Amino acid sequence: MSQASVDMEDVKPSISLPSDDGGAMEARLTDVCKSKLALDESTMRQAMILFRESKHILLANMSAIGSGSPEEIERFWSAFVLYCVTRLSKGRTKQEKEENGITLCRILRVLKMNVVDFFKEIPQFCLKAGYILTGLYGSDWEKRLELKELQANIVHLSLLSRYYKRAYQELFLPNDASSGRHSVAPNSVGYVSDYHHFGWLLFLALRIHAFSRFKDLVTCTNGLVSILAILILHIPARFRNFHIQDSLLFAKRTAKGVDLVASLCDKYHTSEDELRRVMEKANNLIVDILKKKPCAASECKRENLAYINTDGLIYFEDLLEENSLQSSILILEDNYDDAINSKGELDERMFVNDEDSLLGSGSLSGGSIKMKRKYDAMASPAKSITSPLSPPLSPASPVNGNPVIKMVPITPVSTAMTTAKWLRNIISPLPSRPSTELLCFFSSCDRDITTDVTRRASIILGAIFPTTSFGDCCISGNLQSVNQMDSIWAEQRKVEAMKLYYRVLETMCRAESHILNGNNLTSLLSNDRFHRCMLACSAELVLATHKTVTMMFPAVLEKTGITAFDLSKVIESFVRHEETLPRELKRHLNSLEERLLESMAWERGSSMYNSLIVARPTLAAEINRLGLLAEPMPSLDAIAVHNNISTGGLPPLPFQKHEHSSDQNGGAVSPKRACSEYRSVLVERNSFTSPVKELTLTLNLKSKLPPLQSAFASPTRPNPAGGGETCAETGINIFFNKIVKLAAIRIRSLCERLQLPQQILEWVYCLIQQILSQRTALFFNRHIDQIILCSFYGVAKISQMALTFKEIIYNYRKQPQCKPQVFRSVFVHWPSTSHNGKTGQEHVDIITFYNEVFIPSVKPLLVELGPAGVAQKSKSSPEDSNNADSQIPGSPRLSPFPNLPDMSPKKVSAAHNVYVSPLRSSKMDALLSPSSKSYYACVGESTHAYQSPSKDLTAINNRLNSGRKVSGRLNFDVVSDSVVAGSLGAQNGSSAPAPACSILELPVKREQPDS
């Protein structure tokens, strides 16, 4: 096969500008700075310096930024420069309250861009120009830029605004007293009533003055519900869309009337104590900002307060009367203007108008999730639909005398609130100290480790949840300090994480002791790294439940001193031993494991390389050349000092010094147990087995499992399970097995989108296995999707298929895990012997990577896969099998494509033309609307919180067997057998793969790349 047969033939033409146009771009940016943004001289000078320093990067990467004209790309780059300068210069000079602050919204409006496009492209700028920003603003520029936090904030605000709009429209009529003054009709899509507008502005005031700058989703939702309570009390009753005596809407009642706060908590799954606290803060804001006089609602006789138990409620006489409403809105607007001008933040008022062009209509999370429905943008690269704790079915108002069951809309906000309810009801009541049973396990070790465990938990969780402010704003006057609120919030979350940690640890110990018939678990419980991983998991679940913005994953890794590879060892064990864990949190952990496998475990500084260098000594030179090894895990004392945590005078852990001096990648073990680790049930079914043994374990679920201790032991230590492997070899085989499984899922999904035959799928899968085994270094510091995409194109070329890289990328963009930087920025470290004369490190597009790195390394493997290679193999003698490119000794054997969950339709019965099929990702969006979802029964998903799905299935069966006659006849001829038969391929085991000759003759679906 010639080089031409594997090189790229459909390279995207690079967009370039005339050589003298750099000066014109600089002049246009100067004009924007002066005439449109009115920047001061210092900021404008810094902007021009950054633009000049990075101009060569812009000109060299025009084709990798945006997707439009050179003018559009220039606007992108100008926006990046201006945003970085305005944010970083303030951070450097501490001018947080300077006048005429430049907000991101103002920059985007001037440059005619939207938020979604900006955040989709700015990672490219940061990656390409990162070294320039480091030189100008210091190594901490990325942390000070707060891009991830701001993006998460935008997604949360988008979700909250829709949540608020839906709740408002359910409670109040769309028109109000001043609607006649609006140019937009009350029933128009873009119409927002004054009362609606007032509520959102009051919520923003609450966010600014009572919450920290980046607050979690659950706290913000509590704030919105408190605003709804205030609106119910103050909006004139004639604009209500409900009756206060409606027992279905306001279910909580007392002898004095409706308990408004308790009813709203019941409806929106909020904490009553928390809601009352937030309402008090909102009332204080009304007093301090709007200068309204509060009075006890029990002393007021107003129509709005009829049938409501007013004990403990505050009422403001003229808060939302027509004569004062407009002035109140203007005061809140002015107050918000002052706030954002001093902080340079986003103008969050735009979210009250769903049609604001600044929001855009793209996706902030990759895949097909749009800005208007970014339900899981911050939690997972994979899409999810619901949670077992999704809001239950709630009765609607009776229609024609018959009660109708109405599905409560399932949104990320409602899901977060019901998940928080699990934390509140199941975890919070637990003790914050080890139980008597857990203390027994601690004291049964070779020495009592109780002090070690509790000290470690206090330090690690104290680092993750510091009692200092998460934000940086603090207000004066009668308003409460944000720092104090943050300290209370952090302490609450710390206690929740500690309770969860002790609960799961106790369950693990109990399961282990049953297997061992004893309570001495020294080997496991004395392992520092194991406990840190458990603490990180517990903290991450608490953070994920509250949807925090400031502590998004992987922040817990940095705080605990572990790596992504470490955490991947305990995720499944953690899920397995917390049976009440809501499905939404299980999905979150699964998505984290996917992120760890696809890229994070391959990054520089991953402890995976410390094991790999032992398991595959031939890779040591490349690992050292790239500087990939992990640093020693920081001691608890170092973490305590760094985070200013008091250790309470407790002595340091006795085994810390030993770990750092002799066992950087594992935990210390008791000398008495150094060679006697036991078998453990704390691991998933196949995660700690060699890939070649997978089939055996699949068929025999009772097989003995290797110990979890070995996963955290020194890489050079012999595996107690035997087989002559070191712990490093066992761990790497497990890790590689997971990588192969993840790759198989993504290969099949992309094959389906590309409509490629089964043979291509198997060849790509085989090639990935060979690369992982024989060309492992290709994965170093890269994303596995980069290798998968190149493998697709390479296999297409040797198969002589008319498949272009554009088509591959076009369809990859539709994958839920897609991120543009995967194919735009591939890490390359040119060796000193590089044929192109380049040296050092850089990030290139995937086309350059394919031609310059991938093909030179993988070409021999591709040749073997092709028809010529297969024919040559059949003629070769046994002695020829051990050539340079054959499988290396000790590497996993190549396996056929695994039996993944079948996505093909299957016929239910030979007598009926009825087919059932697992839900495809392309159909998920349709289920997200309540009206559509009511037509589906999702197996494994409960319709009520804390209810077993089996009860739902029983109810469905009872309804089906009730004997009720259907007046019409179902038409089963809509889908013919012949249509479905085509999709019942080899995946179902019902047909053999098509011959190679026919495969190569299949037409390849061609589509134009998206813009």
Swiss-Prot record:
Its keywords, alphabetically, are: Cell cycle, Nucleus, Repressor, Transcription, Transcription regulation
User: Which is a Gene Ontology cellular component entry for this protein?
Assistant: transcription regulator complex
Q: Which InterPro entries match?
A: Cyclin-like_sf, RB_A, RB_B, RB_C, RB_fam, RB_N
Task: List the Gene Ontology MF annotations in alphabetical order.
Answer: RNA polymerase II transcription regulatory region sequence-specific DNA binding
Q: Which region ranges are annotated with the description Domain A?
A: 411-612
Q: Where is this region: Spacer?
A: 613-729
Pocket: annotated span = 411-860
- A Pfam family (short name) is RB_B
GO biological process terms held by the UniProt record: cell differentiation; negative regulation of G1/S transition of mitotic cell cycle; regulation of transcription by RNA polymerase II
Subcellular location(s) of the protein:
Nucleus
Bias class Polar residues marks the residues at: 873-889
Q: Which residues form the signal peptide?
A: none
Renumbered residue ranges of the record's region Disordered: 1-22, 872-903
Among PANTHER family, the record links this protein to: RE32990P-RELATED (PTHR13742:SF17), RETINOBLASTOMA-ASSOCIATED PROTEIN RB -RELATED (PTHR13742)
State the family named in the UniProt similarity comment for this chain.
Belongs to the retinoblastoma protein (RB) family.
Biological role: Regulator of biological processes that recruits a histone deacetylase to control gene transcription. May play a role in the entry into mitosis, negatively regulating the cell proliferation. Formation of stable complexes with geminiviridae replication-associated proteins may create a cellular environment which favors viral DNA replication.
Protein name, as recorded: Retinoblastoma-related protein
According to its UniProt entry, this protein's organism is: Cocos nucifera
Quote the gene name from the UniProt entry.
Answer: Rb1
